[in-house]
Amino acid sequence: MAQQAADKYLYVDKNFINNPLAQADWAAKKLVWVPSDKSGFEPASLKEEVGEEAIVELVENGKKVKVNKDDIQKMNPPKFSKVEDMAELTCLNEASVLHNLKERYYSGLIYTYSGLFCVVINPYKNLPIYSEEIVEMYKGKKRHEMPPHIYAITDTAYRSMMQDREDQSILCTGESGAGKTENTKKVIQYLAYVASSHKSKKDQGELERQLLQANPILEAFGNAKTVKNDNSSRFGKFIRINFDVNGYIVGANIETYLLEKSRAIRQAKEERTFHIFYYLLSGAGEHLKTDLLLEPYNKYRFLSNGHVTIPGQQDKDMFQETMEAMRIMGIPEEEQMGLLRVISGVLQLGNIVFKKERNTDQASMPDNTAAQKVSHLLGINVTDFTRGILTPRIKVGRDYVQKAQTKEQADFAIEALAKATYERMFRWLVLRINKALDKTKRQGASFIGILDIAGFEIFDLNSFEQLCINYTNEKLQQLFNHTMFILEQEEYQREGIEWNFIDFGLDLQPCIDLIEKPAGPPGILALLDEECWFPKATDKSFVEKVMQEQGTHPKFQKPKQLKDKADFCIIHYAGKVDYKADEWLMKNMDPLNDNIATLLHQSSDKFVSELWKDVDRIIGLDQVAGMSETALPGAFKTRKGMFRTVGQLYKEQLAKLMATLRNTNPNFVRCIIPNHEKKAGKLDPHLVLDQLRCNGVLEGIRICRQGFPNRVVFQEFRQRYEILTPNSIPKGFMDGKQACVLMIKALELDSNLYRIGQSKVFFRAGVLAHLEEERDLKITDVIIGFQACCRGYLARKAFAKRQQQLTAMKVLQRNCAAYLKLRNWQWWRLFTKVKPLLQVSRQEEEMMAKEEELVKVREKQLAAENRLTEMETLQSQLMAEKLQLQEQLQAETELCAEAEELRARLTAKKQELEEICHDLEARVEEEEERCQHLQAEKKKMQQNIQELEEQLEEEESARQKLQLEKVTTEAKLKKLEEEQIILEDQNCKLAKEKKLLEDRIAEFTTNLTEEEEKSKSLAKLKNKHEAMITDLEERLRREEKQRQELEKTRRKLEGDSTDLSDQIAELQAQIAELKMQLAKKEEELQAALARVEEEAAQKNMALKKIRELESQISELQEDLESERASRNKAEKQKRDLGEELEALKTELEDTLDSTAAQQELRSKREQEVNILKKTLEEEAKTHEAQIQEMRQKHSQAVEELAEQLEQTKRVKANLEKAKQTLENERGELANEVKVLLQGKGDSEHKRKKVEAQLQELQVKFNEGERVRTELADKVTKLQVELDNVTGLLSQSDSKSSKLTKDFSALESQLQDTQELLQEENRQKLSLSTKLKQVEDEKNSFREQLEEEEEAKHNLEKQIATLHAQVADMKKKMEDSVGCLETAEEVKRKLQKDLEGLSQRHEEKVAAYDKLEKTKTRLQQELDDLLVDLDHQRQSACNLEKKQKKFDQLLAEEKTISAKYAEERDRAEAEAREKETKALSLARALEEAMEQKAELERLNKQFRTEMEDLMSSKDDVGKSVHELEKSKRALEQQVEEMKTQLEELEDELQATEDAKLRLEVNLQAMKAQFERDLQGRDEQSEEKKKQLVRQVREMEAELEDERKQRSMAVAARKKLEMDLKDLEAHIDSANKNRDEAIKQLRKLQAQMKDCMRELDDTRASREEILAQAKENEKKLKSMEAEMIQLQEELAAAERAKRQAQQERDELADEIANSSGKGALALEEKRRLEARIAQLEEELEEEQGNTELINDRLKKANLQIDQINTDLNLERSHAQKNENARQQLERQNKELKVKLQEMEGTVKSKYKASITALEAKIAQLEEQLDNETKERQAACKQVRRTEKKLKDVLLQVDDERRNAEQYKDQADKASTRLKQLKRQLEEAEEEAQRANASRRKLQRELEDATETADAMNREVSSLKNKLRRGDLPFVVPRRMARKGAGDGSDEEVDGKADGAEAKPAE
């Protein structure tokens, strides 16, 4: 059942894959993948293709959708569903990979191969696929033999390590929560099982057990619950498992990286600290809790979220498991307790609370209970500990100074100490584990490294730890990319293989450089180290430096979140991560209070002192010097060159790790997280897709498919696979490469499957696996042969032995026969009687000699024993000496090791100091060099400036020359253009367009004058805007002045408020003191309650006023804060307005260059400016009103505070007076008490001794009563005070809520106004951006005309000078407004043209993007098809060769086709005849196929018979020789049958091929007869006749073959009958044997059951006896208790009588002393109360006695019941003993029966074996005859096949040639048509291009002509202005003159150029 459950999660359901309905559905619907927002991709059927889009119907809902063709991805056939290796997919794309992973995940298949690596998806539940049975399944198996699993990856790594002697590494990578740690555990589990030196897997070795237990310990101390993962590794580890030459584990070593120690002191919401804290608090017993001073969860400050549980995990059980793991690891109990004490100490450190002293910033510790607990746990002095934290000694120069710490510094020191302690403990634990795992002395030959490091993390708040973790993951991903993509391809190129380098674009080096680059520009870690060197450096300065240095880096961004949440953003491979740089400098430096560190080093606890043994390497407070008074611990000054930062150490550690990984052969396991909710069975497709893209899964599969992932060195290839090609390599020396080439030729591998390099042979994926299978088969054959030889040798030896035995038996028989003859002979009898008598005398002598020898031997034995004892004593002495020496040696080695460690530390320290010195010297030199370099640069710059000035002058002169040259070149250009125009005028269509353009140019010339008027109006607008800007600037200045005044008043108020707060604090302290005094007085004096109540009322009033003062102060503070906020907002507004003003200026300058459409925008802007002015004025008014209100509030608050101060002073005076009166009253009451006490003393002397005792009791009772009443009074008073306080609080709360509402309303109003302003600003900015975009487009078009504008520069200057004159003249030209409108229309047309062009441009860009996408998609498809292309190339070459022949034939056939149309019918008739013959041949083939099937079935039967015969081998083993003989004969038979079967299969295959060929040929012949019936009648007839003959021959041969086969079938049937008889005999023998074995097993089972019952009875008897003993003990204890209770009862009764007597006496005394006065009355009351109490006690005693009696009764009942049970158990034990004796008897009888059965079975077997041997001999003879007959038949069949093949091949070739020729002709014609179309399109495009070019040229010419006309017009205007007579119709006339020349763009450019000058 367990195996079936496991198979469900390992193997794919084959029925699902081979479903024909799904295959048909896929083929019919044309299913594809379409993008989906919900599920990533969804299936759809392709319905129609329309251009670049396609219409698809969604499978899920049947909805039809239009999708871009580029977004559609191909779907794989259903047979590839849930494929185990994604490299096998035919269509490799994102959708297919995601679908495959999703299908497998939903089926419970979490492992999937992806080319060379494995993809794992976290199932979030336990699967039954990690048991020992599964490990055994995967052990030693090849990858392709088993389904994907982590065990398969581990096994391949282990096998390749053993085979290649190369170190391996298994890298589990992925995000946090993807399952890396769990897979690492499974890897270790597999290796511990497979590579264990102990072969009995149930009892594993100690080392393997320790290796498995290392993980739980490290997880307990280093793992924690996070948001993403319940068991997240908060440290990285690299587990190195060492193996010896034989592959056994000899040791292990664990390296850890970057423990997140800050988690020990604080955790995020819903997260836990390290597991061990919770394990300890839940699992510790009461005794342990008291020893470790443990408290509940909520009492610890360091457990931020209290007791957070993990679902499905019990912390209590986990604690026990962890402690058990430590025991297995060999950690002694002392060290375990030391660990637990440190953990408790860390928790207690969090409970130390510091407070700020009243008048100073110094910290104090009001309650030192937590400090006492810490010092007790860590073995240090409390006073030294508190002094070290509050006033540590710091080295200043040469002296030591005690410096008082602030509260913040003390808190920081405690947290740093807690973190350091936990980290050191963790490091010690890792070293201890390594010591346990490395204790073996065997040398490791190679190792497997397993990397489990924290996954990629993106939290809400990411800090320094997350940066280090993500940096590590970047490096690992880069290693993966480098090994998979770059190194792979580089090796191909090195080895000289034909390979085109593919760039997959997965280089992560830029991101790594951003983090780790040391210089040019420095990375983040380098900048962090640099900031740690600088004094007064803060986290803020570090962030600024990062922004400055890396701001332009492509992988670096400014965060989009608020500054509170993030400081900068890095684009990692897994996504963007926002980092918050809080306390990064401190985390990087990791400073510590060295006073406490030395204290811990000197601890009385050995464990703690060992943890802190390297105190000299700590960054202490003397190194972190000069803390500023106001700054927090983030602003320390560090002394240079005194430490190495955390970042540096981690970087070095990581570099070492990467170096070791590069030296190994990496095996990648890519872990994927399916969802963030930790739900089983849920998969988020987009999340998985992102991870697949980041991990480079698709690229990895692609390179695995395209490349050659398997490679073998030449020597190794030859050595390993030479067995497959035994005779291919000649004898003698041969080069490895040549040998490999010969071997590959012999193996007949396809050339596409391999490549031969310079030193290796490269194979495609799967080829080596195939070779390995063939090698295994070959080796099995060789071994079978070897076994046969061995068995033959053994059989021969056994035969020779039998022969010797036979001869010996003959000798014995001969001797026995002789004795039988002699025994009755009388002389022989006499001889036998006399001979012993002769030997008697000799025997006596021999006995004497023997006795003497015996004495000597005994003496020798005694001497030897003495020697032996001496030797043993000597040995024991030597052993003791040896042990002493060993101990001494161990001590010496330990001392040596410690000395070595010290030496290493000193040398390391020395090296560090030397490095620091060198660094400092180098820096000094660098600084000097920089200074020199800067000075030199300064000089160079000055020289450069001079040179540049000279160059500028030269360039100006050169520019003038160039302008002259330009004019000449333009003239030449004009000539060339004129020639072009003459050539192009031939086209009639273009002439019409030219006329239209000329008309437009005429219109433009008329509109030019109107444009000039517009420019003038724009200039006016500019002046207006400038005036407005100046006004706004003046207002801003006023605002700033007002703000400054407000700042001054605010500072004054802040100062007043601080003074008031100090006074209030003093008053509060005084009130607290008064409270204490009042409490004391209340305890001493009950009479003064009324006065105290009055004082309490006054106190409440004072408290009320104080609270009011506090609320007022808080209100003032809130007002101040709001004032600050408003000031900041005003400053922001000021900045925004300034930016807007600048934008407006730029816009005004730009508007002078714009057209009429932009005038509308200007008018809008003017309106917006007016609105802005209004809003600004309103805001200024509101702001002034607010400031006035604030001032009034402040003045009122100050007055109120002053009044309250006076009131508090008055209250204080009253309280002091009340205090004095109370003290007086106390004195008076004390006197009265003294008098009363004297009276009481007199009365006490008179009373008896009993009364004295009673009085003492009563005094005690009264004191208790008094205390109770006083407490009750106090409680009532406090309750009253509480009620008053709550009332006051509620009043103040209501007031504060009202104020907050008002304040929030005001704030909301302000925010609304600000939002309105911001929206307006946004709109303006958007408009300005749009304007700029339009202008940019305009400028891009103008760039074509820049050359002409430069030429006209001089003319424009002249125009600019005349603009002033022209402006005056234009006032008179207001009548020509109509022209403006026409110009505007023209401009609109131009804008439309521009928009059209821009749209075209955008369309082209979009089309380009689409083409790019299609290009990439096609590239991918092309890569996939390249493999198929190699196969197709050969056929293409053949087709090209035949193309030429076909062209010739085609020409001939066209001429003759008409002639042979008549003869078509005749050919068709002949074809029909041939078809009938072909059908008959097909029938014959079917019959042959049936015969083949029958033969196969027979073969299977023979195989089963063989197996049965093999299984029927005798268990006893006597007739092995005969059975082996029969087996060999049967094997020979089977081999012969196999050969015959293979021959028959070959024949059948040939016939099938012939059939197929005939069918194809017939169809080809039909087509051929239709096309080419050209003079080939005779040839066809002859061929036909030949074919008929051949068919007849074939038919005859087929008939012969059928006869022979029928004969063979008959013979086979005979054989089958014989075999069946044999089988029947064997079955009967087997049945007999099975029955005997079954009986034996039954008997054995019965015996076992009996033994079990016997054991059970014994155990139960022992248990009963133990219970009886326990019951007897309980009885005795109960009896003792009963006696004790009886004694107590008697004592209670005595006490009761005494109490009753006392009561009577007291009653009498009370009756006598009733008239004594007030004192007596009081005493009476007391006595009565005492009596009542005594009565209550009596009642209680009675109740107790009753309970005791009940218990006694119950105990007696229990005793009786126990006695009865005891008797029953004794009788039961007796019965069991009798049953046991009976079972032993039965057992003996069964054994006797068993021996008898075995004898009978052996005799039966011998008889059956002899019969079988005889039958086997007969069968062998029959088989020999049959084989001979079949060989003859096979020869005949082969001859006929050869003839048939030759004929069919001839026919086939002719048909194929004809078809190929026709296809090639069709293709050629289609190609020609396509080429023609392309030519036509190209010609059209050329014509369009020429037309556009002509248009532009014409426009250029028109522009130049209009410019000339404008110049002329300007000159004429000047002349007329001088004269003073200028008519109004000049512009229109000019327009008419300018008709026929100029263009749209030129006029626009001209106008722009004209208008640009005034804007300057």
Curated annotation (Swiss-Prot):
Belongs to the TRAFAC class myosin-kinesin ATPase superfamily. Myosin family. GO terms for molecular function: actin binding; actin filament binding; ADP binding; ATP binding; cadherin binding; calmodulin binding; cytoskeletal motor activity; identical protein binding. It comes from Homo sapiens (Human). It is found in: Cytoplasm, Cytoskeleton; Cytoplasm, Cell cortex; Cytoplasmic vesicle, Secretory vesicle, Cortical granule; Cell membrane. The modification Phosphoserine is found at S628, S1114, S1714, S1943. Keywords: Acetylation, Actin-binding, Alport syndrome, ATP-binding, Calmodulin-binding, Cataract, Cell adhesion, Cell membrane, Cell shape, Coiled coil, Cytoplasm, Cytoplasmic vesicle, Cytoskeleton, Deafness, Disease variant, Host cell receptor for virus entry, Membrane, Methylation, Motor protein, Myosin, Non-syndromic deafness, Nucleotide-binding, Phosphoprotein, Receptor, Ubl conjugation. The modification Omega-N-methylarginine is found at R1923. Residues 27-77 form the Myosin N-terminal SH3-like domain. The modification N6-acetyllysine is found at residues 8, 102, 299, 435, 613, 860, 975, 1024, 1234, 1249, 1357, 1392, 1404, 1410, 1459, 1638, 1793, 1802, 1845. ISGylated. This is Myosin-9. InterPro entries: IQ_motif_EF-hand-BS (IPR000048), Kinesin_motor_dom_sf (IPR036961), Myosin_head_motor_dom-like (IPR001609), Myosin_N (IPR004009), Myosin_S1_N (IPR008989), Myosin_tail (IPR002928), P-loop_NTPase (IPR027417), RGS_sf (IPR036305). The rodlike tail sequence is highly repetitive, showing cycles of a 28-residue repeat pattern composed of 4 heptapeptides, characteristic for alpha-helical coiled coils. The keyword Transmembrane helix does not apply. The modification N6-succinyllysine is found at K850, K1669. Cellular myosin that appears to play a role in cytokinesis, cell shape, and specialized functions such as secretion and capping. Required for cortical actin clearance prior to oocyte exocytosis. Promotes cell motility in conjunction with S100A4. During cell spreading, plays an important role in cytoskeleton reorganization, focal contact formation (in the margins but not the central part of spreading cells), and lamellipodial retraction; this function is mechanically antagonized by MYH10. (Microbial infection) Acts as a receptor for herpes simplex virus 1/HHV-1 envelope glycoprotein B. The keyword Transmembrane does not apply. Disulfide bonds: none annotated. The lineage of its organism: Eukaryota, Metazoa, Chordata, Craniata, Vertebrata. The modification N-acetylalanine is found at A2. Residues 2-838 are annotated as: Mediates interaction with LIMCH1. Residues 81-776 form the Myosin motor domain. Residues 837-1926 form a coiled coil.
